[in-house]
Amino acid sequence: MPLNKNTGLSDDEEQYLKNIGFRIQYLRKQRGLSQNELAEKANLSYTTISHIESTAPYGISIIALFKIAKALDVDPYKILMFE
């Protein structure tokens, strides 16, 4: 499978990261939180939240995933798995 020259990721990997960003954005909005509010609750920077949600394939660290899940009061599994 060819890799993107800029990211080093396959199309499937890029799409998975985009889906994670979409899922976090959906859960955040469902709870009525702004990106700034989620960043504060998760003890992360606004830029980190913005990058994750922007669908740009920056990736997400395991620690950031757990902090965001805790701030959103969901199991990290709910962010990683799509129905």
Model region roles, listed by residue range:
Residues 3-30:
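A short, Lys/Arg-rich alpha-helix, primarily the initiator
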Residues 73-83:
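Short C-terminal boundary/hinge segments that cap the last helix of small helical domains
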Residues 56-70:
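Short, basic-rich loop-to-helix N-cap that marks the start of a DNA-contacting helix
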Residues 24, 38-39, 49-52, 79:
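Conserved hydrophobic/aromatic packing and binding residues within compact polymer-binding modules
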Residues 22-41, 67:
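Short basic helix-loop element that most often maps to the first helix and adjoining turn
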Residues 43-59:
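Recognition helix of helix-turn-helix/homeodomain-like DNA-binding domains
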